Amino acid sequence: MKINKAAAGDTGSLLFQTAYTGYAELGLAGENAFSIKVSDGNMWKTALAIDAGGRHTRPNQPAMRAYRTGTSMTPADGQQTGFTHFGVNRGGFELLGSTSGGGSAILVPASGTYLASLQVRTASSSGHVTAVAANGSASALQVAGPSGSSGTLSASMIMELEAGDILSLHHSGTATVMLGDGSTNLSLAML
């Protein structure tokens, strides 16, 4: 079987339907990159695209990097803080509500296995731990600085997250935490 299209902007694809409503499509849909698209019956999303060089992208695969704007903060022992901006946001992450220490929590869009990375930069510390909190409980993803320390700490791990999980940062001890995208941030990428 061959599917041919007359011009680059045309479509040459296989369309899978239920009751004449399209729910999946694979082929050359409006461009020359091969793609697999899915629909809820109203809106199409590209699940996978492969260009002429053989490179693939997954434009709706959840991935994000979140940070909080400002200069610095000194969260109280036991306080939770959040984020104000996304440096990268793909796949439906949202900032949700507000945390006790300012900023918003992050709403996870899809269940799955994620690579998570936490970076925390401090100007000073009296001994502190900053951990990613999932639904209010501190997780194993954390960084710790001894008393008298300053600088950048980072840690990463693979985490199982569920759609609807709410993520924030949980602080123990005392530290002056530097803010901004290059200072303190959380990154997640669904594997």
Describe the residue ranges of each PLM region.
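Self-maturation zones of extracellular/virion spikes and adhesins
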Residues: 1-44
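Surface-exposed coil/turn segments at beta-strand junctions on protein surfaces, enriched
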Residues: 29, 41, 107-111, 148-150, ...
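Solvent-exposed serine/threonine-rich low-complexity stretches and specific carbohydrate-binding patches
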Residues: 140-148
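Noncatalytic modules at the cell exterior or secretory-pathway interfaces
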Residues: 159-173
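Conserved aromatic beta-strand anchor motif in extracellular beta-sandwich/beta-rich domains
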Residues: 131-136
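Short sequence segments immediately N-terminal to proteolytic processing junctions that release a mature
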Residues: 36-37, 46-62, 166
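Terminal (often C-terminal
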Residues: 55-130, 142, 156, 176-191
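Short, surface-exposed charged micro-motifs
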Residues: 25-27, 47-49, 105, 158
